[in-house]
Amino acid sequence: MLGKIVTKIFGSRNERAIRRMRKVVAQINQLEPEFEKLTDDELKAKTDEFRERLKKGEKEEDILPEAFATVREASKRVFGMRHFDVQLIGGMVLNDRCIAEMRTGEGKTLTATLPAYLNALSGKGVHVVTVNDYLAQRDAENNRPLFEFLGLSVGINLPNMAPPAKREAYNADITYGTNNEFGFDYLRDNMAFSPEERVQRKLHYALVDEVDSILIDEARTPLIISGPAEDSSELYIKMNKVIPHLVPQEKEDSDTFQGEGDYSVDEKTRQVNITERGLVKIEGLLAEAGMMKEGESLYSPANIMLMHHVTAALRAHALFTKDVDYIVKDGEVIIVDEHTGRTMQGRRWSDGLHQAVEAKEGVKIQNENQTLASITFQNYFRLYEKLAGMTGTADTEAFEFNSIYRLETIVIPTNRPMVRKDLPDLVYMNEKGKFAAIIEDIRERTKNGQPVLVGTISIEKSEEISQALTKANIHHNVLNAKFHAMEADIIANAGLPSAVTIATNMAGRGTDIVLGGSWQTEVAKLENPTEEQIEEIKAQWQKRHDAVLASGGLHIIGTERHESRRIDNQLRGRAGRQGDEGSSRFYLSMEDSLMRIFASDKVSGMMRKLGMNETEAIEHPWVTKAIANAQRKVENRNFDIRKQLLEYDDVANDQRRAIYTQRNELLDVADVSETIDSIRQDVFTSMIDNYIPPQSLEEMWDIEGLTACLQNDFDLNLPIKEWLDKEPELHEETLRERILEKSIEVYKAKEEIVSAEMMRNFEKGVMLQTLDSLWKEHLAAMDYLRQGIHLRGYAQKDPKQEYKRESFAMFANMLESLKYEVISTLSKVQVRLPEEVEELERRRREEAERLAKQQQLSHEVTKESQMSAVDGQVASGKKVGRNEPCPCGSGKKYKHCHGKLG
């Protein structure tokens, strides 16, 4: 109560922030007449003036009014567009490390030019982050004339660009690109083998467009750079034949299962659980297929890999649906983003799930991947010195932005009052009744010339609605992940009189639907249009625009509520832009996913008791409240998942930072010999400690073990026993010194053969390769630890604390292994004189020719003998990976040594 009184007197936090900024807006407006008098050259010179003032110690906040006035005046001259006062407020919010919530059509792209210009003046670079390549290119090209007029350079960071082009884009004052590409470049830079391979500068200021989509919807998706692991496609195909024999349990209500079944599906958590009956059945089926011995348990350690494949195949069949979660295109399974309805080319599910879906769909199964480097968007964007974002819908997630990213959300007032009518939800008993009502509503509205946008939550639903409209003879356009290329065209025409457009969630996001259609699109279709033609097109557009406004503006129909209120608000926000007329309504049924899984069973019970049929709808505040509560439940659960993911990833993040810092320091120095000497001393000290405990009696020494270890791990053949027999005065300390001296002596002898410079390069290469190899193994080990750590809860232990403790111990072990392996590899390397290398190369060529002849002969004999000849070439033991060290001991990768011969 007291809080409400205080808010009434002093205004909310948001209102107070806006009031404070309006004072600065007044200063900018006062500067306008003065800046209008400046010539183009004088206006351009302001950039150098601001840079000088910043160098002399002035802060960005000190020059903000003048900088914003400069951008506004330049925009008027270059684009003929003047920033509104609310856009100036938006620019200030973005400069203050906050999130600006700006409604659709309020000009977010133009607003972004203000803080981008101001923060680029320091010369440290500004990254403008968008959700897809199309928007990155569009915004960069649209704003380039303005920034170049003011003397700033603009770069675009796109996938598949060559490193020099990427470096040039990053060295620009303002760089546009997607969240994925910025994140992947960061990971790639931390896998580089020379400073020249790196493309990014220090991360200074990120301005994130559609910030809710990137920092919240995609927060659970880590960016992973991976390499191929062992091929196990045969196992996925076999498992795919087993799963269809299993029967799911029936669901009694939203939380309980009943009756017999082999597995239960929890749609809330998207998990499948095998029942006792199912376990027995699976074990029997696997034994029949010869994949497991009769009477063995699926949970035994020997079958842990089979259990992994069973779970992946079961999830693929029970939880992932074609045209909802993924599409199959050109023999490939492509993921569909659940939040935007866009396809995510190149993205793959991990833990064998993608391979299981490929087996289910009968397409070619790609190899499983092994993680080489990974980071979540949460941790990547927190690396920037300064972070800000803008979106049309952030207020519902304000708490999450604040608690995870320390970003306050400020709602920016609209330039004109919003007059869109948001009509109450209508709830039907089933989908059939809902679809009939939607079609009737569309028919009525298009009769009056009103354009309609129908929002669906999946490709499958958009196609169902499309079929129903085709049956009803209603002309319409479909915009979903399958028709990606036509997106801009369809959106440009969605505001035409009587146009009907069906769109999955937020396909076409970032493009405004203009009432009456887009006259610019019509002009673009003409070759060299005359002024008269342009004026004629504008006049026709004005007539259409006025007709659409008179019919009620754009009408939005939601066919289902999304799990998040924010996504529903985004759909509504497509109508009523810039004070235009518009309306929206959601049509729901008790068969919708959200209603079925989360909404109270009481609602459907109440509808049945009222004796409602499928054509009747219920419209009541209770129902709206039940739906809002259901959405709140899901939002809270998703927030908890993201928060928990971050808490676990923070542990890995500390280790990642330590490794990447060490790696970058290593890249930047030319000579690592001092580090190698220091590591050698540590390694030999701890290794000798294992065989000669410090301050121990000679009888406790394991001389045989020490000699063998030096020979096997460091290629040192030292007569330690002889030394001790001949020199009784040789005590522990002097023995340690002698072993170390001998190892240095042998190493220096190698260095004299090949030159110090070559040895320094080799040392650096070995350190980097060993670090990368062990980090890759460490990431896999951390992943396994993470998957099973929740079970510690049953032992009354805190899983998070256990994860921190164990991962730290693993990290410490990894660093010790790094030292040991580096010294071992450097000690074992065989150094050859040039003439010896030529002789070895001659022998290798002869061996390759002999094998080639042998293969040629094997093709000429029968199939059976051919098989035996091939079998004769297969070495026994573990298959050597292409990127592993060659077993011959050369120190080269297998693919560059004996792997070439096959």
UniProtKB/Swiss-Prot annotation:
The entry marks the following residues as binding Zn(2+), namely 886, 888, 897-898
Q: Provide the catalytic activity annotation.
A: ATP + H2O + cellular proteinSide 1 = ADP + phosphate + cellular proteinSide 2
Cofactor(s) the protein needs: Zn(2+)
Q: Explain how, and how many, cofactor molecules are bound.
A: May bind 1 zinc ion per subunit.
What are the recorded GO MF terms, alphabetically?
A: ATP binding; metal ion binding; protein-exporting ATPase activity
Q: Which Gene3D superfamilies match?
A: Helical scaffold and wing domains of SecA, P-loop containing nucleotide triphosphate hydrolases, SecA, preprotein cross-linking domain
Instruction: Give the enzyme's main class according to its UniProt record, as a single word.
Output: translocase
**One Pfam family here:** SecA_SW
SUPFAM superfamilies according to UniProt: Helical scaffold and wing domains of SecA, P-loop containing nucleoside triphosphate hydrolases, Pre-protein crosslinking domain of SecA
Give the CC-aspect GO terms: cell envelope Sec protein transport complex; cytosol; plasma membrane
Sequence positions that bind ATP: 87, 105-109, 512
Write out the entry's keywords from A to Z.
Answer: ATP-binding, Cell inner membrane, Cell membrane, Cytoplasm, Membrane, Metal-binding, Nucleotide-binding, Protein transport, Translocase, Translocation, Transport, Zinc
The UniProt annotation puts the region (Disordered) at 850-902
* EC identifiers of the protein: 7.4.2.8
The role this protein plays is: Part of the Sec protein translocase complex. Interacts with the SecYEG preprotein conducting channel. Has a central role in coupling the hydrolysis of ATP to the transfer of proteins into and across the cell membrane, serving both as a receptor for the preprotein-SecB complex and as an ATP-driven molecular motor driving the stepwise translocation of polypeptide chains across the membrane.
Q: Which family does it belong to?
A: Belongs to the SecA family.
Q: What is this protein called?
A: Protein translocase subunit SecA
